[in-house]
Structure formats: C-alpha cells, structure tokens
Amino acid sequence: MESGNIVNAQPKLSGIIDGSKSYMYEQLWKLCAGPLCDIPKLGENVYYFPQGNIELVQASTREELNELQPICDLPSKLQCRVIAIHLKVENNSDEIYAEITLMPDTTQVVIPTQSENRFRPLVNSFTKVLTASDTSAYGGFSVPKKHAIECLPPLDMSQPLPAQEILAIDLHDNQWRFRHNYRGTPQRHSLTTGWNEFITSKKLVKGDVIVFVRGETGELRVGIRRARHQQGNIPSSIVSIDCMRHGVIASAKHAFDNQCIFIVVYKPRSSQFIVSYDKFLDAVNNKFNVGSRFTMRFEGDDFSERRYFGTIIGVSDFSPHWKCSEWRSLEVQWDEFASFSRPNKVSPWEIEHLVPALNVPRSSLLKNKRLREVNEFGSSSSHLLPPILTQGQEIGQLSVASPMNISLRYRDTTEAAMNPSRLLMSYPVQPMPKLNYNNQMVTQIEENITTKAGTNFRLFGVTLDTPPMIKDPIKQIGSDISKLTERKKFGQSQTLRSPIEIQSKQFSSSRTCTKVQMQGVTIGRAVDLSVLNGYDQLILELEKLFDIKGQLQTRNQWKIAFTDSDGYEMLVGDDPWPEFCKMVKKILIYSKEEVKNLKSSKSLSS
C-alpha cells in the first residue's frame, strides 16, 4: 500500500483479519480491548459515520465540524464494505487500536473471506485488576487459585515449595519470564521474579488490568489494559501529520467521490462509528420516541460490564450542519448516578429498547418508591429542598429512623419517568416505613402519640407536611420496643438497651446485608445472609424481594450469580453455604440468555 490513506480501489486482498498475526494474538487483543469492543467482520456491509471518527481524532468535535462542513459536502453516513482489518498496538503506550479499510458503496469487489470452519484452538484466559500489593516494588502478583490452575502451566505439587519459571509473550512479541510460586501462609499462587521488571517497563499502576491467555499447546500470552483515567483520545503516533492537516472528512470525501478505499483508525472505548448494516436497521426500526425507556451497556471502573437505565427526553440533530443524522440523535436522562461520565446524547444502535413489564404487581412498584437526592452528575440537589426532604433512603441499604422521624410523601420514580407530565402533580402515597431494632420492617406505631397540627405548604406543586411534634420521644421509643417484644418472641434472649445503643446496633447490623441486583430492575434490594440457613432459604427470600414467586426455584428463566472479593462472577450453589457467605460481595440475578452470553465472553465462571 501507499504511504497515504487513499490507495487503488483494487488492492491485493488477503481475505483474513491480519495474516501476520496468530490466533492467540487475536484473542489477547480482544481481551485487552474489553467486553464492549465491537469490531466489524471482514466483508461485512457497514455504515460509516464521519462524525464519530472526528470525535476519536479531535477533542473539540463540534468546532471541527463547523470548520470543515461548508467545504466538504459529505453525507452524514456512508454505506461501505469492510475490505481489511488489522489489529495493532501502539509501541510506547501499549494502547490497542484497529486499522479498518473501507470501500464506499462497493458491491462489485469480491472479498475472499475467512472460512467459518477453520480450526480455532481452545484458549483459557483471565483478567485481574491490579491492587496496590500487585504493583508494589517489593511484592509480587497474586494469582487467584482457580485461574492459576486453568491458565498457568501446572506446578509439581509434590515438591515442598512448588515453583517454576514461565514464559509469556506480549502483543509486541516481547518475551517476559516470571517465577511462579505456591507458598505463604495461607498458601497462594504468585508471580515474583521478573514481575517487578514487567510492571516497571509497562508503567502499570493500581487499577490497571493484567490479561493472561494460554492456548492448547501451552503458549502463554500476556497483555495489559490501562485504567480509564490514563487513556487519551488517540496516540499521536497513530495519526499522521498529513491526516491531521487535511482532516478526516477530506479523506472520506475523496474516497466517496472516487470510489476508492480509505483507512480509518478505531479505538476501543470510543463510540461505535462503524456500524453493521443489520444492526443499524434494527436500531432505526425500534423507533425510539420521547419517553421511551432504554438500557445501555458501559464499562465500569473495575472493567466489568454494567447496564444503566434511562429515558429518552429528546430527538434532534447533534450538529446543525449534518441534518437528519442518526449520530447521537437521542437526548437521554439517566436514572441513577455513576462514578464515571456518561453522554447526554447517544446513538440508536448504542442502546437497547426496554419494554415495560405490564404484569408487574402493584406491590412491587410500592417497594420501589424512594426520594432521589443526587442528580445525573452526582452533585447534591439538597439546596433546592427543605431539610425534611433531604433524609432519603439509599437503595440496597438499610436506614434507621431517628426518634424525631417524620413521614414523607415521595414519588414513584418508575412511573414519573414513563409519564413526565406527572412530575408537577401531587398525589398521596404510603408513608415510608421505619425499622425496628431487629431490622424488620414494621408499621409505625401511632398509639399514645400526641401531635400538634402541622402546617401544609406546597413546593413545585407538591404538598409537603411539616413534621409533627412528638411528646417525649425517648419514652415513646421505649414503649414501642416493649410492645414489639411482647408481640414477637425471638430465639435467644435479648436485653433492652437505651435508644442510642439500639440505634447504634441497627447501623452495625445493616452492614451485614448483601446487595442484590436483578437484570431489568433499576432499583436493587438487600438481603441479610446471617439469618438464612442455606441456598433454599436464599432463593425464597430473593423471590419475595422481587415478587417472582417460583421463578428462581425452577431455574428455567433466571440464574443466580455472585461476585467475590476479587470481583469475579460465579454461579451460586457450588460452594458450601458458610464459605459462600464469607466471600460473597454482591448477588446478581441474570436471565438465562444473559448467562449464556456472559459464559461465552468468559465474564462468568460456571
């Protein structure tokens, strides 16, 4: 090929993704790219969006469009055919990227594609987020036992101190030698000698990810993935000075007018601007309207795939110069706060339409009522509300009502999102329940409580009640506790303590609860494993929390998984119950289809 981006329309085609790279290289590259990286297939019909390419190259997308669009009359999208794909890695930073060769509107060029039946060896792999200990100068790399057995060459466990030297190859074909040990108290797998040289050379820090891949022949590959805050838009060595000077639009315009191929650089974590033809049509046919609910996949700070829910609040052009373009045409509002920045305008193919569940019981909706205190960007909005409205309850955690607890009127966020006009309407709802000293939800006892008439006022059309005055609240709490103790006898004797001690105990016990998240349900729950005696009781409790009686026991529709302290996801049931309670950090309920997808991407261990 020539040095420029534009070459002859009939190049010599190899018919494979990258003939100079091995299958192991390809697998390692994809793992380093992450679960959300979507590379088109060779010979596939795609739509190319110049706006997205400019986003990758230039930080100021709109300014670049304003300067170049009057000169180059280029459509907002080009229908192309994928001619070649080269998976590459930047020499200095180890940033991975793909060079994708496209041909506009080419139907006459025959592309020899890969055989679908070609031999694909089995590979084992694992990824781990580096800890402070992993990156310290005097430590080593701690390998989880399961991954050490599956992905590293086997040790001779008959030796008093099993150890051996292993050889791993990175994406630059550089060889790295590590000493694999199994020792310590308790014994654990670790990489010591050679590890410090590796992290120093790669400039790895806490939060980065290490990737190991091992093939059937024993070949071991190693790669890295840098944390989000360390990644720039695009390495300067990738984009030539000539390309930056003439701009992406000029290159695409020349290829479009002359029917010749052009090369674009695609980088993982960037918005998808090369979209398969079928995926684009499916997205457009979904007809996303204002008020439609959707879910979108993101990569979290721990490099795991997460889904966030939102509502479409507008449909408009992202740039005034590119009329009727689907690129970032949907203005969205997110349901919940995230620790990383999310776009307020997305493209239709980036999201999935969320069909509302019409058969959800009313009792389930009542459980989901809460007061939202944090806006999309995480800034507190409590300065807009009176003090009585800033005592919200965080989902998935238990909160304790103080002696001066008040009843609040709060909104159903699910109903409000589906019908924005109701945001300015007031309607009565059930008061928030309080917690008794045994962490059981009870109805507020109103006997023997003398109140003063409160004053009603309105804020944004919502009627608010001033808190009633309670006479002698400490005495009242003691009376309430006595009545509850007589009503329900516990398995072990309990000594009544002062209200301050009881409230302290409530906060302490709330930390023993485990967060539960169900696919398709925005609001999470919490379950106390210490009061359960096994998996059967856990299943019954989860069914009760999400109002899906009998659906978890059959396991035909839903599967239960969990994450451990290392962040790995596994299906429940394989570990003894006491051991499961010690290592579980979060419980997840996935659909059967989602479990299959996670297993295929090796994000979930069976």
Curated annotation (Swiss-Prot):
Main localization category: nucleus
The organism's taxonomic lineage, starting at the top: Eukaryota, Viridiplantae, Streptophyta, Embryophyta, Tracheophyta
Entry-linked SUPFAM superfamilies: CAD & PB1 domains, DNA-binding pseudobarrel domain
TM region positions: none
Top-level taxon of the source organism: Eukaryota
GO biological process: auxin-activated signaling pathway; regulation of DNA-templated transcription
Function: Auxin response factors (ARFs) are transcriptional factors that bind specifically to the DNA sequence 5'-TGTCTC-3' found in the auxin-responsive promoter elements (AuxREs). Could act as transcriptional activator or repressor. Formation of heterodimers with Aux/IAA proteins may alter their ability to modulate early auxin response genes expression.
Record keyword Mitochondrion present: no
Organism, scientific name: Arabidopsis thaliana
Keywords of this entry: Auxin signaling pathway, DNA-binding, Nucleus, Transcription, Transcription regulation
Domain comment in the entry: Interactions between auxin response factors (ARFs) and Aux/IAA proteins occur through their C-terminal dimerization domains III and IV.
PANTHER family linked: AUXIN RESPONSE FACTOR 12-RELATED, AUXIN RESPONSE FACTOR 4-RELATED
Gene Ontology molecular functions: DNA binding; DNA-binding transcription factor activity
InterPro entries listed in its UniProt record: ARF_dom, ARF_plant, AUX/IAA_dom, B3_DNA-bd, DNA-bd_pseudobarrel_sf, PB1-like
Protein name per Swiss-Prot or TrEMBL: Putative auxin response factor 21
Family statement: Belongs to the ARF family.
Subunit structure: Homodimers and heterodimers.
Keyword DNA-binding among UniProt keywords: yes
Protein localization: Nucleus
